[in-house]
Amino acid sequence: MAATAVEAWDERWATPAGRADWLVPHPAVAGLVPVLKARGAQHVPDLGCGVGRHALFFAEHGFAVEAIDGAAAGLDFACREAAARGLRLSLRQADADALPFADESFDYVLSWNVIFHGTMGDVGRRLAEIWRVLKPGGLFQGTMLSKRDVQFGRGRAIAPDTFIRGSDPKAHPHFYCD
């Protein structure tokens, strides 16, 4: 993700108002915990963890968690929250384009509302990294934006199916796919 986008997330995560919509785990993620436990998953990465809503949730359910984000303010908040709750998280400021893990490290990888921030090439590199660190037969849970989304085509086109909304220099691209 571009440095300016990371700066924008740092600004957002630094305030309670900016974090407010990102504190509760998404039900689709929370609902997968029984499946992960049944499959024997123990060590999970949350790529683009933001303020840690999913990373903290997984830690509360006994998983060893790798919380990864480009924005330091989100990681700082997740670190404070983990300490306040008596939870352990491994927090890393890193880019999903080059994950700091060995091949086939995880039974499950989460990337919620993150990997579509960029062009098709960016998304492809992130998906390649996810597949690299995912064990054979492992599960990937993530989100993408659809061309059927009402936001598709809004903003300034910077690449095929990729748009930046708004004129803020810190705005980041959104890639839409079929």
Which residues does each predicted region cover?
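A short SAM/SAH-binding and catalytic strip from SAM-dependent methyltransferases
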Residues: 108-122
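A short glycine-rich, Lys/Arg-flanked "PGG" loop and its adjoining helix->strand segment in the class I
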Residues: 124-136
